[in-house]
Amino acid sequence: MSKVASIVDVLQGKVAIGETVTVRGWVRTRRDSKAGLSFLAVYDGSCFDPIQAIINNDIKNYESEILRLTTGCSVIVTGKVVESPSEGQAVELQAEKVEVTGFVEDPDTYPMAAKRHSIEYLREVAHLRPRTNIIGAVSRVRHCLSQAIHRFFHEQGFYWVATPLITASDTEGAGEMFRVSTLDLENLPRSENGKVDFSQDFFGKESFLTVSGQLNGETYACALSKIYTFGPTFRAENSNTTRHLAEFWMVEPEVAFATLADNAKLAEDMLKYVFRAVLAERKDDLQFFEKHVDKDVITRLENFVNSDFAQIDYTDAIDVLLKSGKKFEFPVSWGIDLSSEHERFLAEEYFKSPVVVKNYPKDIKAFYMRLNDDGKTVAAMDVLAPGIGEIIGGSQREERLEVLDKRMEEMGLNPDDYWWYRDLRKYGSVPHSGFGLGFERLIVYVTGVQNIRDVIPFPRAPRNANF
């Protein structure tokens, strides 16, 4: 009985020439020659390239099944690994046996027929789009990046903490949250003042899907010193753009005794680590993106890992923008939140490198960010990358209880809702810092794929929760 091997192992020479092997996968294409041969391109998702299987017409099911194979059919091919005479592939399979495990019922109506499909069309058949070159490549890159993130933090002595998806706290204070409830919408219980009585709900209070694992992460950082979260987060933001999702994944490290400078260094080290990993491990997929999606993909990543990060205070960045002579769609003045055009000007035109903008006005940042001595700014930072703008947002956290309480009061937040978060400042409080990285935005940057809905398996967005 021949051994079963993944196609990537066969193509990378891990199976010896002359050895008989079995590969299992799906037909990408079939072509027939007048010499009584058929050539099957078979892929199994283990790498970008399919393997070519050469099938002689003396195979017993050649007429009955092989000549009926079309794109998408599933097959198990057993054959001898031989050197390929044609360009582009070092080896191919000389088939000895081909078992068809599944035909495509109607090739004429198969949504993934062998032709080029628009990325917009593929979103309508999200259950089948992993079979395409582009989504297959995105999926392998996504896996590579996630593994590299876990590896980086593990090597740096961090612990991964699973923070809850259901919460009663609003980390961002923005109120754009999905409510979680088991109450009967047709017969809602009401209190005396006519408001919904959430005390009768499943959790006994108003509850939501989390917008961030940060607050929970801080509790563990104040015990384990270095932790990170990596999981799904949710925003009920009614934004139908190429940059927004209602459900997305966040990477959120949190470090006790860390300053804003430590935070910026951690962000730089992490990004460079994961970019080096994807350049080394997913060269085949990146070459596809370079050829068909964004010609600058590989160059951009190589430049990133070889660049020193620039740093600039928000106030100085505003001066740079005002003196640039450039007409921006959104006017520049001290106190604004930088828009994407401002961020990209700084990273792409002014610094021509990744840049950390730090010390933002307190009024545009969250309540938990540490108030600076000037009383006007907080120890916040954004990492801006050429080609996309903001890729990471973070801060040193406010460790002084009285200052935290004052900030919450200014923002109209009820301290009682955050009693456990305030406890961290009562019992052995320490300076600590952390940041958030939108994982899908990272994948957009790495692949050059323009719409964030194409880098997550099943995108969730306004009026879109199919599949």
UniProtKB/Swiss-Prot annotation:
The keyword ATP-binding applies. PANTHER family: ASPARAGINE--TRNA LIGASE, MITOCHONDRIAL-RELATED, ASPARTYL/LYSYL-TRNA SYNTHETASE. GO terms for molecular function: asparagine-tRNA ligase activity; ATP binding; nucleic acid binding. Belongs to the class-II aminoacyl-tRNA synthetase family. GO terms for biological process: asparaginyl-tRNA aminoacylation. CDD domains: AsxRS_core, EcAsnRS_like_N. Pfam families: tRNA-synt_2, tRNA_anti-codon. One of its GO terms (cellular component) is cytoplasm. Keywords: Aminoacyl-tRNA synthetase, ATP-binding, Cytoplasm, Ligase, Nucleotide-binding, Protein biosynthesis. The keyword Protein biosynthesis applies. The gene is asnS. It is found in: Cytoplasm. Its EC number is 6.1.1.22. Its main location: cytoplasm. This is Asparagine--tRNA ligase. It comes from the Bacteria. It catalyses: tRNA(Asn) + L-asparagine + ATP = L-asparaginyl-tRNA(Asn) + AMP + diphosphate + H(+). It comes from Haemophilus influenzae (strain PittEE).
